[in-house]
Design a protein with these regions (language model features):
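Outer membrane beta-barrel transmembrane domains
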Residues: 66-79, 237-377
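Residues that define the transmembrane beta-barrel architecture of outer-membrane proteins
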Residues: 49, 94-98, 138-146, 162, ...
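Residue-level detector of the transmembrane beta-barrel scaffold of outer-membrane proteins
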Residues: 52-54, 111-113, 147, 163-167, ...
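Short loop/turn motifs that connect adjacent beta-strands in outer-membrane beta-barrel proteins
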Residues: 24-28, 41-50, 62-66, 92, ...
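Outer-membrane beta-barrel pore domains and translocons
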Residues: 56-60, 117-119, 151, 169-173, ...
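Outer-membrane pore/translocation modules
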Residues: 117-234, 305
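Extracellular loop and loop/strand-boundary signature of outer-membrane beta-barrel proteins
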Residues: 40, 84-88, 129-136, 193-199, ...
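Residues on the lipid-exposed face of transmembrane beta-strands in outer-membrane beta-barrel proteins
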Residues: 42-44, 55-57, 100-104, 114, ...
Length: 377
């Protein structure tokens, strides 16, 4: 944790205090904008007839409860059988997500992208059962995003300093929404649906829209990215997730021909769930005594205890180990959270991403297995 406390200050110092850099075209291809944080979806349009691939590993920690802007203790909500309390209360949550993405550029202005993921969640709970503490667990594939990105404007076709792009796509329901509890201390609760937040999927086909603005003022790269996922349809359990909206602002400084530092502000707003699952109504899953007329077992089961607004600050380092490949490390902490609660609040996120570009024989950059030196790699 000492390293994590030092990292943001060190990266900000590089951004602010580093001496004037030489002229750079960026670590990524000049056509796609040169530099962009790899955690932001769809950065730039790749060179025509080129592939790009991205592998990312993220760890997220959530610690303590929040209702609105007020931090709460789990003891404020139980565990207790008394009215107004819950029989099970979350304490902490850890999430590991692996994401794999690929893209191909068909023209100078259009690229198709696909992103898939796998998530592993563990949540520490305290309950009225014996033993009282246990760890709830789930894992599985997430929904898959299929998107197209079109460049609406650029001031130069080959190496733009200003460009505006739009993203249209869909999230396909490849993630499950019916994962069940396997290790609850009360045996009758095993085999029952896990709460919403432990399900890796949405169960619905969801449209995606985005808009990205990028600008270069060498050695600085900057931009703003807006994305929304709209939840319009009910899934097989007769509910839908809340729609999501994200806005990312970033500033990057390239201080070396193979390295740069970045700072981001990442805002997100999302809605609650429309209803409880069908299994809750029919079988009493997530209700006390497994009776649909009784109170919720835990605040995680209440569809209204989701949604909110948060803002994270993110610092990062990108490094080019070999031509056409980039490694990135990002660290994020929340600076504002307003949650419909009680629900677990964000503590911090750590993400490592590896990215590589693969020119095909049709690409203007194709030179066999050697790097295109004329573009500065």
């Amino acid at each position: 944790m000492k390293f994590l406390k030092i990292l943001p200050s060190a990266i900000l110092a590089v951004l602010i205090l580093s001496s004037n850099a030489l002229a750079y075209i960026g670590l990524c291809c000049a056509h796609c904008g040169g530099n962009m944080p790899l955690n932001i979806q769809g950065g730039g349009i790749p060179e025509t007839h080129e592939f790009r691939f991205k592998l990312s590993q993220m760890y997220m920690s959530m610690d303590s409860l929040r209702d609105g802007t007020d931090e709460k203790s789990y003891g404020d909500y139980g565990p207790s059988t008394a009215a107004g309390n819950y029989r099970g209360v979350p304490k902490t949550m850890n999430s590991w997500m692996t994401m794999v993405g690929g893209a191909y550029s068909f023209t100078d202005d259009f690229a198709a992208m696909i992103m898939a993921g796998y998530v592993r969640n563990s949540m520490d709970m305290t309950t009225t059962a014996t033993p009282s503490d246990y760890t709830m667990f789930s894992q599985g594939a997430t929904d898959t995003k299929i998107m197209g990105k079109y460049r609406l404007y650029s001031d130069d076709n080959l190496a733009p300093k200003t460009q505006l792009s739009t993203i249209l796509g869909v999230a396909a329901p490849t993630g499950k929404i019916t994962i069940k509890n396997t290790n609850h201390p009360t045996k009758t609760m095993r085999g029952k649906l896990l709460p919403f937040g432990m399900q890796p999927g949405s169960g619905t086909w969801d449209p995606i829209f985005g808009l990205t603005y990028q600008k270069i003022a060498d050695p600085y790269w900057m931009g703003v990215n807006f994305m929304t996922t709209q939840r319009l349809f009910l899934n097989a359990q007769d509910y839908k997730k809340g729609s999501e909206y994200t806005v990312d602002l970033y500033l990057m400084r390239q201080f070396h021909e193979r390295a740069l530092a970045s700072f981001q502000l990442n805002g997100k707003a999302w809605g609650d769930y429309s209803d409880q699952p069908k299994k809750g109504k029919e079988s009493g899953d997530c209700h006390a005594m497994l009776m649909s007329t009784r109170d919720w077992m835990t605040p995680l089961c209440d569809p209204t205890n989701y949604g909110g607004v948060n803002l994270h600050a993110t610092v990062g380092i990108q490094f080019q180990p070999v031509p056409l490949q980039i490694a990135e490390l990002n660290f994020s902490v929340p600076i504002y959270q307003n949650l419909k609660g009680p629900q677990l609040q964000s503590d911090y996120m750590l993400r490592f991403t590896y990215y590589w570009e693969v020119p095909t024989k049709k690409s203007r950059r194709y030179v066999g297995f050697k790097a295109p030196e004329k573009l500065g790699f």
